[in-house]
Amino acid sequence: MSETITVNCPTCGKTVVWGEVSPFRPFCSKRCQLIDLGEWAAEEKRIPSSGDLSESDDWSEEQK
C-alpha cells in the first residue's frame, strides 16, 4: 500500500505529485523553478535574520 503525497507548487499553487514523476518538485515545471530562482537572485526573497553583527561581518579582504 503506497500513499501518494502531493504538495502545492510554491510559485503557482498547482498540485504536484511528490515522486519520480515530478522532476522539478516541489515546483510543477521548470518555468516555476526558474521564476523562484529569479526571485532569490533579485533578493525579493531572503532568509530572515536577527540583524546582529557577527565577528565575520568585521572581516575585510584588505589587510590592515
From Swiss-Prot:
Pfam families: YacG. Binds 1 zinc ion. GO terms for biological process: regulation of DNA-templated transcription. Residues 45-64 are annotated as: Disordered. Its cofactor is Zn(2+). It comes from the Bacteria. Zn(2+) binds at C9, C12, C28, C32. InterPro entries: DNA_gyrase_inhibitor_YacG, Znf_NHR/GATA. Keywords: Metal-binding, Zinc. Residues 54-64 have a biased composition (Acidic residues). One of its GO terms (molecular function) is zinc ion binding. SUPFAM superfamilies: Glucocorticoid receptor-like (DNA-binding domain). Inhibits all the catalytic activities of DNA gyrase by preventing its interaction with DNA. Acts by binding directly to the C-terminal domain of GyrB, which probably disrupts DNA binding by the gyrase. Belongs to the DNA gyrase inhibitor YacG family. HAMAP family: DNA_gyrase_inhibitor_YacG (MF_00649). PANTHER family: DNA GYRASE INHIBITOR YACG (PTHR36150:SF1). Interacts with GyrB. This is DNA gyrase inhibitor YacG. It comes from Citrobacter koseri (strain ATCC BAA-895 / CDC 4225-83 / SGSC4696). The lineage of its organism: Bacteria, Pseudomonadati, Pseudomonadota, Gammaproteobacteria, Enterobacterales.
